[in-house]
Amino acid sequence: ENINLDISMRPRHKRKRGRKKFLAGVQQKTAVKEAIIFLVRFNLFSIPLYAAILTGFQWGFLMDITSNIVVALLSSTGIETTRHGNIIAVPVKDGNFGAFVSWDSTGWKSMLAMFALIFATAFPLRKKLMGLALIPVVYAVNILRIWFMFFISTVDTNYFALAHLTIWSWGLIFTVLALWVLWMKKL
């Protein structure tokens, strides 16, 4: 018995299924390759973040600006504040509550992560440069995060840790990822 494996001899519906499987396999391999390229690029563009962490680099100017903006925002929303360097204090029920606006409080990691996410994509340079406009948005959300933590402290200082460690740490990560996805889809 002679079996001819020529695809043209197979019924038409089986040929289509064979092509679909082949194309699905090619698309899957392409998607894996693109994901690997993205991850490599992301890590390369994250080198400034890694370098700053390893060297202990801190930019005091950004800490000062962040403190100034937060104090102005707190004051403009009716919350009395005092500031000593980068320590901001607000009145609470039994006295004052203060917190230090540290280097990590500036949102620098989130801003660098946003930069790396944008530039790791395969989009044209023009779109990437337009995406950089989202970095100030990340900074503004971070400022609101700090304001909210001081605001919630005026209600009850026990809420500060919850707001800081849980809600806003994850909230800032979510914000960066949501802005990045929005940028990829819409902008």
Language model segments and positions:
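Hydrophobic N-terminal alpha-helices or hydrophobic patches in metabolic proteins across all domains
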Residues: 2-187
